[in-house]
Amino acid sequence: MILIIGGGVIGLSIAWKLIQIGKKVLILDKNKLGKEASWAAAGMLAGRLEAEPGEEKLFPLLAKGQLAWPKFAYELENISGKKVEYKKDGTIMLACDFDENNKLKSTFSFFKKNKINMKWLNGEEIRVKEPYVSTKVLSGIFSKKDHQVNSRFVLDALLTVIKRNKDKCFIEENTEVKEIISNKNQVIAVKTNKKVIKVKKIIICAGAWTNKIKNISKEKIPIRPVKGQMICLKMNKNQPLIKHVLWRNNIYLVPRNNFDLIVGSTVEEMGYNKDLTAGGIFHLLRIAREMVPAIEELPIIDSWTGLRPTTIDDAPIIGPSKYL
């Protein structure tokens, strides 16, 4: 039996792949499965536009991850019978003033230098693609290969597949792992808020809550929560405002097939605080309105916060622990 701590997209995907090769897994989650960062996520697959100076070593991994998504989505949809809304319309990063335009030119040069294929667009070319974009938008970078997926649909599809395999996958929700018990660097059990579970193999997918587990490492794992506030607006189905993902100053607009429009996300170092704030919502709507003014007429149908698991260098932490 392999124990997986955390039932978000990563934990559930690992469970699915282990089941496929005949392994038995037990998934523990402190809440309901998939109700934290994966539920909050907008589903942007922006491994190209998110490439930054100083992170060049990550580029091959980002590219490999993006290339894996079409096959992953296709297989998951076929097996689960559920749609995950993998969309290939692309993403446009926008500049609305002189300073932003200069910064965007620098970003475009960086992409070109690192052979990340993008297309430079002037304001008129952007408005051909997206007629409702503000006339104040001066320029943009179009990334055809930065796609999106509906993260909540992905969760639903993964849960459907996993729950069909009741003989191989066991789930315990509202079960928080408090401590890992080991002997001579070998895991022997985990202590939860309910009981002690004997186990020899653990896969930790606890995200922002990783460091709340005692004895997970002799040193603090460099993961911290970063809060993001988000809003969902409803577009007119007969006149949807945008087709592509739009992105400016770290704020993005993500259109869904059901005409929802996701506006996100703040980036706040607030520990485990998940409050929605007037300032956070105002910031999102202000930037969004500057990109697409007609947004001000759309009804707000939902809002939420999520806690991203974040590292100092933005790199994922993958691999075996030398302490356990």
Predicted segments, located by residue:
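Dinucleotide-binding Rossmann-like beta1-alpha1 core, especially the glycine-rich loop
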Residues: M44-E125, K129, A288
